[in-house]
Amino acid sequence: MLRERIKKFHFIGIGGIGMSGIAQILLEMGYKVSGSDISENKNTKLLKQKGAKIYIGHRPENLGDAQVVVYSSAVKPDNPEIQEAKRRNIPVIPRGEMLAELFKLKEGIAVSGSHGKTTTTSMIAEILINAGLEPTVIIGGRLKRLGTNAKLGRGELLVSEADESDGSFLKLQPAVAVITNVDKEHLDFYENFERVKEAFEQFMNSVPFYGFAVVNLDDPTLAQLVKKSHERVITYGINSPALVRAKNLYLKEGRYEFGVEFKGKELGRIHLGIAGIHNVYNALAATGVALELGVSFEVIKKSLEEFRNAERRLELKGYYKNSPVYDDYGHHPTEIKAVINSLRDMYPDKNLLVVFQPHRYSRTYYLFEDFVKVLKDIDKLIVTDIYPASENNVYGVSAEELARKSGAVFAKDKEEVFEKVREVHDEGDVILFLGAGSISKWCEEFLKEVNLEK
């Protein structure tokens, strides 16, 4: 009854991938939605088409008659719309709390982990859609099949990423908790790795008695947490005695084919639709969820063999002088290593030309040596300036130093990056634009520019 009194939501930072997904679900549920952001993008355009009122720029008057204000983690407390909402005693809640409210309306499958959340969530969504379960879906990237990152389903299940970056995933009350891996990430929030581990342990143990957790047993941190857990846990892995296991793996056409074993029984083989050993793990997580929900192996196999990456996950964007040009969101050393290995599986005899834009001063500072270790193995590397993502450089870290220690060429801005790509490119190279900041737009602009030159 009390919940039904709310009719109008306002989102500050509505263009972000996580915010836009929740806003879209609320629109499809019949709520009125407005929102603001500093610039227009694909997400704001789609929401506008669906009936949202979108404002460019943050102003107090944008709130209109909103009854609840939702803000993203990128929004500062002194934002004029937050200040106006507080002045008018309008509830102001973080994105994670709004997602938690949606979880109360469905049986939630929350996918967490330092890496692989978007791909794993997308795989689970594809399988459940193909199984006719009509899930509600909220993903941190556009699912090719849906053409969007969110969809309201008529079924009882909600599949969503669970963002650990600010601890908000602990607000969720999922029936199924998936953890892909645990890494040294978001140390600006957690301060140390022990706190990261504690948060994931709490998340794993948050499932109700009728639910279950799905956990990567090959991850050493998670293997330790599983030993301590009293909840029902479905483990998966390749090298460990997990309940869901990939066996007899081999590369075929640049992608892995593997046998699937569940609780000691061989179910059949899958030739995964996308490259990379890390995606075998993501597929095993999705398989574990689906099997426990009663989905047939035939549906799982078909879904994973036909699966294509979500947007910005090793996405082929075009060609430069017959060289394929890829775009990828990877911004952590573990993710960079995974995407580089995937490309080497796909193009074993080619050189890789990588343009890397570090994301956040804090991440670059805390993981500096890890970045150097993974970047120095790249054939041709161009490093550009750090994308701040609302941070100030209080760490004294520099992209020039990262480039120097990694044996890379440094290019300070977009124009210089394009110039350097042309300089170092050779026939047959595979080109990758890599990072979580503006580098994706640069990739598109580079391809437009070179196509105009033809």
From Swiss-Prot:
Function according to Swiss-Prot or TrEMBL: Cell wall formation.
Subcellular location: Cytoplasm
Binding site for ATP: G113, S114, H115, G116, K117, T118, T119
Catalytic activity, as annotated: UDP-N-acetyl-alpha-D-muramate + L-alanine + ATP = UDP-N-acetyl-alpha-D-muramoyl-L-alanine + ADP + phosphate + H(+)
Keywords tagged on the record: ATP-binding, Cell cycle, Cell division, Cell shape, Cell wall biogenesis/degradation, Cytoplasm, Ligase, Nucleotide-binding, Peptidoglycan synthesis
Family: Belongs to the MurCDEF family.
Regions crossing the membrane: none
Protein name (Swiss-Prot/TrEMBL): UDP-N-acetylmuramate--L-alanine ligase
Lineage: Bacteria, Pseudomonadati, Aquificota, Aquificia, Aquificales
Sample GO molecular function, one term: UDP-N-acetylmuramate-L-alanine ligase activity
InterPro entries the record matches: Mur-like_cat_sf, Mur_ligase_C, Mur_ligase_C_dom_sf, Mur_ligase_cen, Mur_ligase_N, MurCDEF_pg_biosynth, UDP-N-AcMur_Ala_ligase_MurC
Pathway: Cell wall biogenesis; peptidoglycan biosynthesis
Any one annotated GO CC term: cytoplasm
The protein's Enzyme Commission number: 6.3.2.8
Gene Ontology biological process terms, A to Z: cell division; cell wall organization; peptidoglycan biosynthetic process; regulation of cell shape
